[in-house]
Amino acid sequence: MEVLVQLALLLVVHGSLVVLVAGKSVPRVIDQDLERYEPLEEEDHRGARVPFNLEETYDQSFRANSFNGTWKTDREILYSDNYVGDIRLFDVTTGSGTVLLDSSVTADFDKASVMFSFDNSHVAIGHDYVNGFRYSIHQKCTVYNIKSRTFTDIANGDRIPLFKWSPTRNALIYVHKNDIYYQVFFEGGSDTRRITNTGVPDIVFNGIPDWVYEEEVLGSPVAFWISPDGRHLAFATFNDTNVRDIVISKYGSPGNSRDQYPNEIRIKYPKAGTTNPFVSLSVIDLHDPSSKLIDLPPPVDVVGADNVLYTANWRRDGEIVATWTNRVQNKAQLVLYDTKGNANNIYYEEETEGWLRIQPPLYHDRYVIVAKLQDSGTKAGRFLHATRLEYRNGALVDETDLTPGTCEVISLLLVDHARARLYYLGTELGKPSHKNLYSVQLSGNEPPVCLSCDVLTPEGNRCTYAYAYFSTNGSHYALYCAGPDPVFIAIVNANHRQISIWEENRSLRRKLAARTQPIVKNFNVNANGYTNKVKLYLPPDFDETKKYPLLITVYAGPNTIRITEEATYGFESYIVTNRSVIYGRIDGRGSAYKGSKMLFEIYRRLGTVEIEDQIIITRTLQEKYSWIDSNRTGIWGWSYGGFSAAMVLATDAESVFKCGISVAPVTSWIYYDSLYTERFMGLPTPEDNQSGYNDTDVSRRVEGMRGKKYMLIHGTADDNVHYQQTMMLNKALVNSDIMFQQQTYTDEAHALGNVFPHLYHTTDRFWANCLGYSH
C-alpha cells in the first residue's frame, strides 16, 4: 500500500546494465578505482551556500549511489564497470578483480541485465523490458554460452515475467504465458520441459503472483522456490477466475488515430469483501522427467477454505515450510511438507488484539526462527522479537525470545550457520526512528550486539540507519549506512572488521556542501495517552521571533513510520530552504515500532485515531511555539497519506489546518484491495465491521472540508488506488457544492513518475497560495 515513488531507481536501470544473481538485481556500479576521477562540482556563487531549487528535488540531482554489486560467492561480488561495461568479479579478501563478461556481449541488447549460472558458464541476458506491477517487469531473455559464444532465445523471443538459474545446474526455470518451464543447457543445445499447463494469461498464474499477492503479501514478482540442491521446485498457483476485474482506460497519444478509442486494460483486483484468488501450493522433482506435480494442501481445518498463502521456503532439501493464514490474517498455521505431499502442522499463532505481522522463517539445524510479538514487561505492550523454536517430535517447541525488551525486530536477514548467529535489522532502545544491524547467538545466552552502531560516517557521525547485503554464507557483508548522512557502504568480514570502502558518494557530498540545509529538530509530544514522535525541519536562517508557515507531510498507515534517520533530499529540502516553510512529520497511534498497545489502537478503525493525532499534535505545536503561524498551516500526503490528508480536513472542526493536498488517495476502503484492507478492518458486512467502513468513508464527511483549500491529484491509470476513489470524492464534494481543485494525470500510474515537473510545479503554486510565499 505504501507509495514507493521509484522514479530514481527506474531511471538508473533504464540507462544501465544490471547484474543479477539468483534473482537479485542491483543498479550498475561505478568502478571504485575510477570514482576519484570525477570532476569536482563548482560551488554556486563562489562558494556561498544556496537553497535547493524545486527541480533538483525530483530530478535525481541528489540521488545517492546504492550498493551496486551482487554477492556471487562468500567472498566475491559481481558488478558492472560503469565506464567500459564489462562484468567483473571482485574478491573482497584480496582486492583483486577479473572480467567475467566483455561488454561487447550485451552491447546490442536494449536495457540489458545479466544473470550468471552456478558455474559462470552461461549468462541469461534480460532485455527490452516493460514494467508490470509494482515489483514485476516483462522482458525478453537470451542465454549466452560463454565457451561456444552462442545465443539462445528463451520462449521464442517473447517477453517473460520471471527467470532464474538452478543453484546446481545450467538449467533455467522461467514462466511463459503463466506456465512454468525448465530448460537444461549443455554443450551443443538445450532441452526444455514444461512443468505446468494450466496457466491462463491474466487469470491463472503459476510461479508468479497476481496483482494482489504481488502488492500485499509477497512483495515480490516471485512465487516459486527452488530447493538448495536444485532438485525440487515448489510453486504457488493463483486462480483468479472468480475475481472481478478493474477496468482502466488508456487514452494514448494526443492526435494519434490509433488511439481514436481508448484501450481498456483489465486487471483481476479483489476489493474488500469480494472473492479472493484461490491459491494452491505444489512441488515437483525437476531432475526426474517423469515426475508429476504433488499438491501441498493448506490446513483448511485451521485457516478455512478462504485462506492466504503468506510465505513458503525450504527448511532443507526435501522439506518446505509454508505459512497459511485465514482471510482476515489474524490466525496462522506453519506447515512442514515433504516432497511427497505429507503435511505436518508444526506451529499455530493467533493474534486477538490486531493482525499478524508475518516474516519468512529462518532455519538452523533443529531450530526455526520466526518474528513474533513478545511481552516487553512494560505498558507499551508487546514488541516483534526474533523467536527461536526447536523442531522436535513433529512440532515446534521450547520457545526462546532472542531479542527481549522494548526494541523491535524490523527484518530477519540471515543465519550464519558456521557461527550459529542470527543477523537482523532492528530499532534501538527508545529510538524507533533508528534502524540498526544486529547479531545474536542462537543459543540465547547472550544479548544482541549492534554491528552498525559504532560505525562512523565520513562526517564522523554514528550510523543510525543501516541495512546489510550478505554473502552466500554470511562470512562477509556490505554494510549500507543511509543515515543520518548520505549513503556510505563498507565491506565487512565475519569478525565485523571493515576491510574496504565500497561507496562514499563523494560527488553527492560535494554537491550538498554547496546547499543550505534545514535545521532538524525532534520532539516528543504527549497526546491521547501516548508519547508521540515529531520531526520538524526549520529554515536555515530560523528566527524564533518570526512566524513561519507549517506544512505537515502525512502517511499514517498502520505499522509505518514517517520519522526515520534516513538522509533524504526531496521536496522538504526545497520548501524549507527556498520558501522558509517549516516542514513536519508526526508518528501517532498506529505507527510502527513503539509497542502493540499503540500499534493496535488503529485496528478495525482506520481513519480515526491516527487522524485525531495529526490534528491534536499539530494544534499542540501551534499553541506551544509562537514561531508557527496557525493561519498558514497545511497538510499533504500520498496514497494512504492522501486519505489521511483528506480525512484530517474533513474532521478538523477547529480548522487547525487551512489547506491540504491528497495525491492518489483512498477515499473509501470498500474500493481498496481485500488483502490489505481486511487485514486491518475486517469484512465490510453487517455481521463484521460495515459500520467501521462507513465511519471512515471520506465522501460521507465532506461537509467538514467546506471553507478549506483542497486539491485532489490522481492518475487515471493507477492500478493500485484506482481513479475511482478520487472520482467518488469529487462527486461528493460537487454534490455538496464545496469548492476544491483537481489535477488529473492522463495514463499515469500510482507513482506519477512521468509527470514530476508538472506535479511539483502544480503543488508549489498551491502551497504558495495557501502558505503565503511568493511563487
From Swiss-Prot:
Catalyses which reaction(s): Release of an N-terminal dipeptide, Xaa-Yaa-|-Zaa-, from a polypeptide, preferentially when Yaa is Pro, provided Zaa is neither Pro nor hydroxyproline
GO CC list: extracellular region; plasma membrane
EC number(s) reported in the record: 3.4.14.5
Signal peptide: 1-23
One biological process term in Gene Ontology: proteolysis
Pfam families noted in UniProt: DPPIV_N (PF00930), Peptidase_S9 (PF00326)
Annotated Gene3D superfamilies: alpha/beta hydrolase, Dipeptidylpeptidase IV, N-terminal domain
Keyword Transit peptide: no
Active site residues per record: 639, 718, 750
Coiled coil regions in record: none
Function: Venom dipeptidyl-peptidase which removes N-terminal dipeptides sequentially from polypeptides having unsubstituted N-termini provided that the penultimate residue is proline. May process promelittin into its active form and/or modulate the chemotactic activity of immune cells after the insect sting.
Family: Belongs to the peptidase S9B family. DPPIV subfamily.
UniProt-recorded name of the protein: Venom dipeptidyl peptidase 4
Species of provenance: Apis mellifera
